[in-house]
């Protein structure tokens, strides 16, 4: 009593916060515990924790069950929860033993907190829009009016508890009403109008985040539901849950915040020592020692916004990006303990009996804490969070859009190659003639309609709204698909002179024809996804009037096997009506050298994270592909200039190439172009080979490949022999290694050593007639000096 105003402002903030993130609802359990401890006495915190677990687990289990089935099941679960609550209420009233009475009291509090969560999440956030969708908008208005009426009645009748509850609900609804701005904005049909929530049905789909799909926690127990990457990495559901969902997707992120981070891993010495973690643990201990009740409340906040989120999200492997932001509430809770730990440390020092010592020591400790915690962490993390000079998103979007011809249609894959492009078009007004088509969204009816209706419109053929609304994957077997050729009027015009390269008579231009395999499988039945159907539909309806492109980031799985009909023209692949060369060298060179922006990519002072480094590989790939094409065309000087430009604009010191084969290919291109090193200096190829050989855990097949390059390309037989001898010592019974070592000895005119290897092999496999014949052949070809050397080695061996 006396603090009602704070509860009401909390209710209003909860309503507002729903519009920012649903994570805020989990603070309800923290608030409930704070109120509970103000009202009731608890004899044992540990019994309380057990009772809360029982109460929340029962309520949560019933909630999860209700979400998996029909609405009637939700009603059944609600009734069950009500019966349990009523039973515990009767137990609370009639129990004689203090422990039993307290148990009932604790569980009732957990039920009450869970009920508050469900009322807000299911009753208000989801219930009001569903009511408008299923019954009508008038029903929602009536429900809100009734809510206000009951509130006024409760206030007038001085039913204080009921009035407080009803006012809190009213304020939550008022805060939640800010969502209306989204629907008002959507009704204006802006160019970016995701989910199109201007009808009650679409509003419900938007609020329930239907476009993201759903995953049940039980999915981790069914390996058939796992992505291939996860199925190969984890041996069981428990292994997957602990090592990926708990350790990788929560503990690792927690360690980043309070211990230290290096790339994607944990660095225990980023902050010199993990001071935030140590002080936080100290604060946790102090909090439980001095105020168990509030410590339990903070612990509830910590767990509900941390490990409980892990259970609820049930994230699959891999994720498209790091998800540390999902657990920010948990990190906030631990930060409270850091503050408590720092305050407790200062308090203990200030209470030293020697006042002459305690005062200066308190100031010194405060200064050290200030240095060790916020300042130290700021200094350690500042560079990684400093975005000054980082133009990657802007330039990457600019370069993709500028890769497209006038009025192009561009298929993109995910967020990184879609949202920056939309920003450039809507804010910077760049290349608004290009229509960006996100393949993930292309599976949704609302997005298909927007592509058809919003300028620049896309011709999707004669498809009705009803057909779009009911569109879904279709059964599909591997079969040929035909797309109509460009019309004669287009082929004879100067709009796309590149079509003349195919050499067909405009009147006899053949259709585009290729085999399309199913892109989705359920059991033995194959399907085409909606996005695949729409790609084919757009191709056919467009009739080549507008150039069509795939962004270079689109995976082969989404290209429907059209690679032979695509030509790379920068950061995009253009689709042609007939098979073409994989690279349009002229357009590629023009875009890479004259159009694209690469601001600050060669500035070592600018921080680029791992995601950006992977993204920049698309630039490097474009340069390398162009260099290969120029080498095949016989223009070695231009090829070398292309590689030099790549090294200058996108230096490997800042953006290292992760793929060893491509890293090595650059060296081979330099060598083929005539860059073979100055006298006494290693060539680019030799430098790269040495780097690869010095990497940890190089597998033997790669070493074989490097030995082959030393021998066949560089003619460095001693180096090749050194690598192969080491491999042969490790794997003496490997025929590939022994055979290649013999071959290199032969090419190096060291037949005595070749015979020595064959002797060792025949000692292991005496029935290998091929090896025996080869040994005899080499013996017959030996020079007298080699024969003498071989005989002396044989005598030493026999001794």
Q: Where do the PLM segments sit?
A:
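Surface-exposed aromatic
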Residues: 663, 740-743
């Amino acid at each position: 009593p006396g603090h009602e105003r704070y509860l009401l402002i909390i209710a209003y903030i909860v309503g507002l916060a729903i519009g920012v993130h649903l994570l805020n609802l989990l603070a309800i359990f923290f608030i409930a515990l704070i109120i509970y401890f103000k009202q009731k006495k608890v004899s044992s915190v540990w019994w309380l924790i057990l009772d809360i677990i029982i109460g929340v687990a029962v309520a949560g289990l019933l909630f999860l069950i209700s979400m998996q089935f029909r609405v009637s099941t939700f009603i059944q679960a609600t009734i069950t929860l009500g019966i349990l609550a009523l039973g515990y209420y009767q137990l609370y009233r009639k129990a004689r033993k203090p422990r039993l009475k307290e148990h009932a009291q604790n569980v009732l509090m957990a039920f009450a907190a869970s009920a508050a969560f469900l009322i807000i999440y299911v009753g208000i956030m989801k219930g009001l829009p569903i009511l408008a969708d299923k019954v009508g908008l008038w029903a929602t208005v009536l429900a809100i009016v009734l809510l206000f009426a009951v509130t006024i009645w409760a206030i007038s009748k001085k039913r204080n508890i009921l009035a407080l509850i009803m006012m809190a609900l009213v304020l939550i609804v008022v805060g939640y009403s800010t969502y209306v701005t989204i629907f008002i904005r959507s009704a204006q049909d802006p160019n970016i109008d995701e989910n199109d929530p201007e009808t009650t049905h679409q509003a419900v789909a938007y609020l329930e985040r239907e476009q993201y799909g759903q995953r049940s926690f039980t999915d981790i127990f069914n390996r058939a539901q796992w992505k291939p990457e996860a199925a190969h990495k984890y041996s069981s559901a428990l292994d997957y849950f602990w090592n990926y969902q708990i350790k990788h997707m929560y503990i690792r992120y927690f360690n980043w915040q309070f211990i230290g981070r290096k790339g994607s891993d944990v660095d225990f010495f980023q902050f010199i020592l993990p001071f935030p973690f140590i002080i936080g643990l100290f604060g946790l201990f102090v909090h439980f020692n001095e105020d168990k009740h509030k410590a339990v409340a903070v612990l509830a906040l910590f767990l509900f916004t941390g490990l409980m989120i892990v259970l609820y999200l049930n994230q699959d492997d891999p994720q498209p990006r790091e998800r540390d932001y999902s657990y920010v509430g948990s990190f906030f809770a631990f930060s409270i303990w850091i503050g408590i730990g720092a305050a407790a440390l200062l308090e203990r020092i200030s209470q030293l009996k020697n006042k002459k010592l305690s005062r200066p020591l308190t100031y010194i400790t405060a200064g050290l804490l200030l240095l060790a915690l916020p300042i130290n962490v700021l200094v350690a993390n500042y560079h990684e969070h400093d975005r000054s000079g980082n133009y990657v998103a802007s330039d990457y979007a600019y370069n993709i859009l500028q890769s497209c011809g006038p009025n192009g249609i561009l298929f993109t894959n995910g967020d990184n190659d879609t949202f920056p492009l939309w920003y450039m078009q809507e804010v910077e007004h760049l290349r608004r003639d290009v229509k960006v088509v996100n393949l993930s969204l292309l599976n949704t009816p609302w997005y298909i309609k927007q592509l058809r209706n919003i300028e620049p419109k896309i011709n999707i053929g004669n498809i009705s709204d009803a057909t779009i609304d009911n569109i879904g994957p279709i059964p599909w077997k591997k079969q040929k698909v035909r797309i109509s050729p460009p019309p004669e009027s287009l082929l004879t015009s100067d709009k796309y002179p590149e079509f003349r390269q195919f050499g067909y008579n405009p009147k006899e231009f053949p259709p585009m024809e290729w085999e399309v395999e199913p892109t989705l499988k359920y059991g033995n039945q194959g399907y085409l996804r909606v996005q695949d159907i729409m790609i084919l539909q757009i191709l056919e309806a467009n009739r080549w009037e507008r150039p069509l492109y795939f962004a270079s980031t689109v995976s082969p799985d989404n290209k429907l096997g059209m690679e032979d009909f695509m030509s790379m023209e920068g950061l995009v692949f253009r689709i042609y009506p007939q098979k073409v060369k994989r690279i349009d060298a002229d357009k590629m060179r023009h875009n890479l050298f004259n159009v694209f922006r690469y601001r600050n990519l060669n500035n070592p002072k600018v921080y680029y994270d791992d995601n950006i480094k992977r993204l920049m590989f698309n630039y490097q790939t474009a340069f390398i592909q162009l260099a290969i094409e120029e080498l095949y065309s016989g223009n070695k000087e231009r090829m070398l200039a292309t590689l030099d430009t790549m090294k200058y604009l996108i230096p490997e010191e800042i953006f290292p190439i992760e793929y060893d084969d491509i890293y090595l290919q650059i060296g081979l291109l330099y060598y083929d172009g005539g860059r073979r090193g100055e006298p006494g200096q290693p060539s680019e190829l030799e430098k790269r080979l040495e780097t690869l050989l010095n990497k940890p855990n190089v597998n033997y097949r790669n070493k074989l490949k490097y030995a082959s390059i030393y021998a066949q390309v560089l003619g460095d037989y001693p180096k090749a022999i050194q690598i192969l001898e080491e491999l042969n010592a490790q794997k003496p019974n490997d025929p590939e290694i022994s055979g290649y070592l013999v071959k290199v000895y032969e090419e190096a005119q060291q037949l005595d050593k070749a015979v020595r290897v064959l002797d060792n092999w025949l000692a292991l496999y005496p029935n290998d007639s091929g090896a025996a014949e080869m040994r005899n052949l080499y013996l017959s070809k030996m020079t007298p000096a080699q024969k003498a050397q071989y005989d002396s080695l044989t005598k030493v061996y026999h001794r």
